[in-house]
From Swiss-Prot:
Full protein name: Translation initiation factor IF-3
NCBIfam families the record matches: infC
GO cellular component: cytosol; membrane
Subcellular location, record wording: Cytoplasm
Organism (species): Bartonella tribocorum (strain CIP 105476 / IBS 506)
């Protein structure tokens, strides 16, 4: 690689081959022409000669506005970045002896997160003597699993880590 290498396709005097396959500014194939002839046609049209397919034999070049081409490729790249959805992991914290209404509120939040396409980590925290009743926590997580089975799949089965039990669910 030379230190003067530029970003993007080669254009005008940077194209160092004797002959190119030329596509004019209307998109019509002109056939194989010499590089001097192609550069003259580009200058006559007031546009640039841009290498489109450098690996072809001879390379395919097109007469277009280089600034416009760079703008369109940047715009296309920005559009694809915008369309990408970043999946987040949302966390819902519950206790083993959660009340009916509180459970309903937490379940509604889980449904909302799943509908938005995010993963949900359900964390069940045990305090003091609650560690002796881990079966209650497991039953609660099984209940969450059953209540969300239509819209979500289990990504990480319920497991105990220290004083808390956790489970991760993801959209189907």
């Amino acid at each position: 690689m030379t230190p003067t290498q530029k970003d993007g396709p080669r254009s005008n005097q940077d194209i160092r081959v004797p002959h190119v396959q030329l596509i004019n500014d209307e998109g019509q194939h002109q056939g194989v022409v010499s590089i001097q002839e192609a550069l003259a046609m580009a200058a006559e049209a007031g546009l640039d000669l841009v290498e489109i397919v450098p690996n072809a034999e001879p390379p395919v070049c097109k007469i277009i506005d280089l600034g416009k081409l760079k703008y369109q490729t940047q715009k296309k790249a920005a559009e694809t970045r915008k369309k990408q959805k970043v999946i987040e992991i949302k966390e819902i914290k519950v206790r083993p002896n959660v009340d009916v209404h509180d459970y309903g509120v937490k379940l509604k939040a889980i449904h909302r997160f799943i509908d938005h396409g995010d993963k949900v980590k359900i964390t069940l925290r045990f305090r003091g003597r609650e560690m002796a009743h881990q079966d209650l926590g497991l039953k609660l997580l099984q209940r969450v699993k059953e209540d969300t089975s239509e819209i979500a799949k289990i990504e990480l089965e319920p497991k105990l880590e220290g004083r808390q039990m956790m489970m991760v669910i993801a959209p189907k």
